[in-house]
Amino acid sequence: MPVHDEQEHEVYGGEIPEEEEGEMDTEEYEEHGGEEGAAAGDEELEPGSSSRDLEDMKKRIKEIEEEAGALREMQAKAEKDMGASQDPSGGVSAAEKEEVDSRSIYVGNVDYACTPEEVQQHFQSCGTVNRVTILTDKFGQPKGFAYVEFVEVEAVQNSLILNESELHGRQIKVSAKRTNVPGMRQFRGRGRPFRPMRGFMPGVPFYPPYAYGRVPRFRRPMRYRPY
């Protein structure tokens, strides 16, 4: 009998947790309002998380656009500064450019290793040198000629004396700088000039219709002779 009581006690004690767990699940289920309450809770969580992600994405896109705008401004400023440094005569009128060209000379056959300071020293005796420009290609390599701008107009004639003088062991070519007029080409004088009309045209030689073979005979027409 004592054994039987213990067995019944053990069986009864093992069923208690199952009932308590079921009661707790039921209470939690009722507190959330059943299936509708659980679904409503999920719907309240999902829109909140997605809206936060959307706000973060918009904020990041705005930051990227601001960075791109700042980069474009820096690039435009750098290109503007570079263009101004490469073209010192930018924004100058045609009259001012012509006046500057009247005080400038062209120097050809310049050694590639020659520096602007050496060119300035070479023409220092002709007058006050204002600027020396050695032209380069897109790779930064010298093209072999330069322009020298003086302060005085008379220095141009004085510099022509140094034509075919030696600089870095090479004979340089010195000439006055010409002003390039847009849309016009200067005639270089090479070849024969164009003649719009010719005063004399030779006659066309006559060739017989039968150049080869037997020449046909042409008979006189027969006249009527009654006697």
UniProtKB/Swiss-Prot annotation:
Placement of sequence motif Nuclear localization signal: 176-183
Residue stretches of biased makeup (Acidic residues): 16-30
Residue span of region Disordered: 1-99
GO function term, MF aspect, one: RNA binding
Recorded coiled-coil stretches: 48-83
Highest taxon listed in the record's lineage: Eukaryota
Keyword RNA-binding: yes
Biased composition (Basic and acidic residues): 1-12
GO biological process: mRNA processing
Main location: nucleus
All copies of domain RRM, residue ranges: 103-179
GO cellular component, one term: nuclear speck
Localization: Nucleus speckle; Cytoplasm
Keywords: Coiled coil, Cytoplasm, mRNA processing, Nucleus, RNA-binding
PROSITE patterns: RRM
Residue span of region Necessary for homooligomerization: 90-227
Subunit structure as annotated in this protein's UniProt entry: Monomer and homooligomer. Binds RNA as a monomer and oligomerizes when bound to poly(A). Forms a complex with cleavage and polyadenylation specificity factor (CPSF) subunits FIPS5, PABN3 and PAPS4. Interacts with CSP3.
Function statement: Involved in the 3'-end formation of mRNA precursors (pre-mRNA) by the addition of a poly(A) tail of 200-250 nt to the upstream cleavage product. Stimulates poly(A) polymerase (PAPOLA) conferring processivity on the poly(A) tail elongation reaction and also controls the poly(A) tail length. Increases the affinity of poly(A) polymerase for RNA. Binds to poly(A) and to poly(G) with high affinity. May protect the poly(A) tail from degradation.
Domain-level remarks: The RRM domain is essential for the recognition of specific adenine bases in the poly(A) tail, but not sufficient for poly(A) binding.
Protein name: Polyadenylate-binding protein 1
Species of the source: Arabidopsis thaliana
Gene: PABN1
